[in-house]
């Protein structure tokens, strides 16, 4: 397969979808890799580095889209790219479709297969391609929030960690997943008092055991959100429903409860935001104010620490990219339900329920798009029906038992959060 890697064009997006080390592995598997010129510059990788790894340097986005069967990116395609996406082409990137009807309709119209990093899902419910960037964004949320608390940026002039004789700041983190936990850890490390809200009691029990003593896991409810907003100096929105629009948990009316100069960092902005007054911003113009509350809603936060982010992203995506390149996207989806979960749009059909629900579009199960003889495996994309019936039953039984054993262990450990 010819695999293309594009230079990102979103404002101040310095990441690239593949490192030279990743390219080397794709080439070792017999694939041709085309890298748009200067694609890795923002992450410290030159065209020469990619050529040494075996890549071909391509002069333009058009050349990449025209010549490559699979195109890899970091952020979603922008409108200028929509006409370049071809029928049958695989686009492998963060899409966050639920935040953009325009993007969703463009990919439907293209006839391409959209494999979204953020919905590739393991049997235990974890999101392996979202996790590394969630870790980065969670850590950055507190760094950025602490900065904009400074008076020179319009904040209240408060140091989160305080100093001897002066009280520490208070941080409210809404959501106890990967983003929330990483944000809470950084805030605790600075010495702040941290309230970490989540709706899953088993998860809260786990967090109570593992988080530092200045972190207080609390049940998430409208009443508790209102209560802790009044105390908070920094609020981090870290809510996620995979593939779907984020719920609006902080309403405009709630801003009136907050102290002037408080900072909100809405990491959920990729999925529409969990704060009613949130709208996407950029690294060029990252903040705005509503009712005296500073909002930081940069949709590509990890792009500012591109060297770390690019390596972490490649570590996560490369195994899946290799499977798609080696087998083709249909066979890869049939054999690996994790990849099947990542397919949001294929052949003009919406194959991910959260995306269809976000815009009132028709949802088509992936197995119907793949065809009547190509069924999914036990929990996502089907056993091979070419096997004898008894063998199929045994395969499904064994896979189902293994899946539920894994899910039960994950639930007990807190890694699996039930709605």
What are these regions (language model features)?
Residues 2, 8, 79-169, 298-300:
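Glycine/serine-rich phosphate-binding loop and adjoining beta1-alpha1 elements at the start
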Residues 2, 33, 349-396, 404, ...:
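Rossmann-like nucleotide/phosphate-binding core characteristic of flavoprotein oxidoreductases
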Residues 2-110:
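An N-terminal-biased, well-structured beta-alpha scaffold segment characteristic
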Residues 7, 11-29, 34-40, 155-237:
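Glycine-rich phosphate/diphosphate-binding loop of Rossmann-like nucleotide-binding domains
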Residues 23, 47, 104, 142, ...:
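Generic hydrophobic/aromatic pocket-lining and core-packing "Φ" positions
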Residues 69, 75-76, 95-96, 221, ...:
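Short glycine-/small-residue-rich Rossmann-like dinucleotide-binding loops
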Residues 118-159, 269, 274-379:
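Adenosine-phosphate binding glycine-rich loop
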Residues 209-291:
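Rossmann-like adenosine-cofactor binding region
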């Amino acid at each position: 397969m010819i695999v293309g890697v594009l230079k990102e064009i979103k404002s101040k997006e310095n990441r690239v979808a593949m490192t030279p080390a990743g390219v080397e592995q794709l080439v070792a598997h017999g694939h041709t890799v085309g890298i748009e010129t200067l694609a890795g510059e923002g992450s410290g990788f030159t065209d020469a580095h990619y050529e040494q790894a075996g890549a071909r340097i391509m002069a333009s986005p058009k050349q990449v889209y025209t010549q490559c069967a699979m195109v890899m990116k970091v952020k979603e395609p922008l409108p200028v790219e929509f006409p370049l996406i071809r029928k049958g082409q695989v686009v492998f990137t963060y899409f966050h479709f639920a935040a953009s009807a325009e993007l969703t309709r463009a990919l439907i119209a293209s006839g391409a297969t959209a494999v979204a990093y953020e919905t590739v899902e393991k049997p235990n419910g974890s999101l392996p391609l979202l996790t590394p960037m969630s870790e980065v964004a969670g850590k950055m949320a507190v760094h950025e929030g602490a900065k904009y608390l400074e008076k020179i940026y319009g904040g209240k002039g408060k140091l989160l960690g305080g100093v001897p004789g002066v009280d520490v700041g208070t941080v409210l983190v809404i959501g106890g997943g990967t983003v929330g936990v990483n944000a809470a850890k950084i805030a605790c490390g600075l010495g702040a008092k941290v309230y970490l809200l989540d709706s899953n009691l088993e998860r809260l029990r786990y967090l109570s055991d593992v988080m530092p003593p200045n972190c207080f896991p609390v049940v998430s409810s409208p009443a508790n959100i209102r209560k802790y907003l009044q105390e908070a100096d920094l609020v981090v929105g870290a809510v996620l429903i995979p593939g779907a629009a984020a719920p609006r948990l902080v309403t405009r009316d709630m801003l009136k409860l907050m102290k002037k100069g408080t900072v909100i960092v809405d990491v959920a902005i990729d999925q529409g935001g969990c704060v009613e007054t949130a709208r996407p911003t950029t690294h060029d113009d990252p903040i705005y104010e509503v009712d005296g509350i500073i909002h930081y809603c940069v949709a590509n936060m990890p792009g500012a620490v591109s060297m770390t982010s690019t390596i972490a992203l490649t570590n996560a995506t490369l195994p899946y990219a290799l499977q798609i390149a080696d087998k083709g996207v249909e066979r890869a989806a049939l054999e690996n339900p994790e990849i099947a979960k990542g397919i949001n749009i294929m052949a003009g059909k919406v194959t991910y329920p959260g995306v269809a629900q976000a815009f009132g579009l028709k949802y088509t199960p992936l197995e119907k798009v793949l065809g009547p003889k190509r069924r999914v495996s036990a929990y996502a994309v089907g056993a091979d029906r070419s096997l004898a019936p008894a063998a199929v039953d045994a395969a499904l039984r064994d896979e189902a038992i293994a899946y539920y054993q894994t899910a039960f262990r994950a639930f007990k450990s807190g890694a699996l959060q039930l709605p």
